[in-house]
């Protein structure tokens, strides 16, 4: 059991379960619905090229979503609008997430999102993560959204630009976060990062003293040295306990 005052969740393949969107046939469905079946083959080929370039849908979604729109969908407004609708319909929270968030809230833990979201297709406060939390009625559990674009206060929408340009993979987001938590008398060992990717969620956070929990409910990258490994968020109830602030 680890005692923590602060908790940061990754978004893609962690809070957000993108299984349905891994299937390139989704793009075929879009052009069938638009009455343009002749575009399906080329669109699916472009999607596969982009997936090969970045490795997985969640990476594309968080950092390169504009390329899905411009390259895969050719900037076609109708196709982009339909993709956004289907995307919202298909994205679901990870298994056991709501129950875990209720528990962490009861434990007086400060709950946040720490994402590698590098670009948005609109105002920062209307990004894909905020939209996901709103649609699934999860927003009230979270205090801040920390990204390379800035830190958003979920309650009032204000943006702290001091995080702009920092990233999880380089570790600079964790450096900044460690400094801020120190001002609140929270040690890195009293904060936990929960995510799936070794290079962004586990290794750089652990190197800076944060507790780490590897989520393998969507994809398991193997043993990467995390303090704990979970496949269902309900497991957090037996792993994490709130520490008195």
Q: Where are each of the predicted segments found?
A:
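N-terminal helical cap/lid subdomain that shapes the substrate entry/recognition surface
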Residues: 2-99, 106, 122
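Asp-based, Mg2+/Mn2+-dependent phosphohydrolase catalytic module
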Residues: 1-9, 17, 32-37, 75-77, ...
């Amino acid at each position: 059991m680890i005692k923590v005052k602060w908790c940061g969740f990754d978004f893609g393949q962690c809070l957000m379960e993108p299984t349905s969107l891994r299937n390139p046939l989704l793009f075929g469905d879009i052009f069938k619905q638009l009455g343009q079946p002749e575009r399906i083959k080329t669109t699916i080929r472009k999607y596969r090229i982009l997936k090969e370039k970045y490795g997985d849908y969640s990476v594309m979604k968080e950092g390169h979503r504009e390329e899905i729109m411009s390259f895969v969908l050719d900037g076609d407004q109708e196709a982009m609008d339909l993709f956004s609708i289907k995307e919202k319909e298909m994205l679901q929270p990870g298994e056991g997430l709501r129950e875990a968030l209720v528990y962490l809230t009861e434990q007086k833990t400060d709950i946040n999102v720490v994402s590698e979201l590098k670009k948005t297709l609109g105002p920062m406060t209307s990004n894909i993560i905020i939209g996901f939390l709103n649609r699934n009625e999860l927003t009230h559990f979270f205090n801040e959204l920390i990204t390379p674009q800035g830190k958003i206060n979920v309650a009032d929408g204000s943006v702290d630009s001091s995080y702009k340009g920092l990233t999880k993979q380089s570790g600079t987001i964790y450096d900044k976060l460690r400094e801020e938590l120190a001002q609140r008398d929270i040690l890195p060992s009293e904060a936990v990062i929960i995510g799936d990717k070794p290079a962004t969620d586990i290794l750089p956070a652990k190197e800076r003293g944060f507790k780490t929990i590897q989520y393998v409910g969507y994809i398991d990258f193997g043993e990467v040295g995390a303090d704990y490994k979970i496949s269902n968020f309900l497991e957090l109830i037996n792993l994490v306990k709130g520490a008195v602030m």
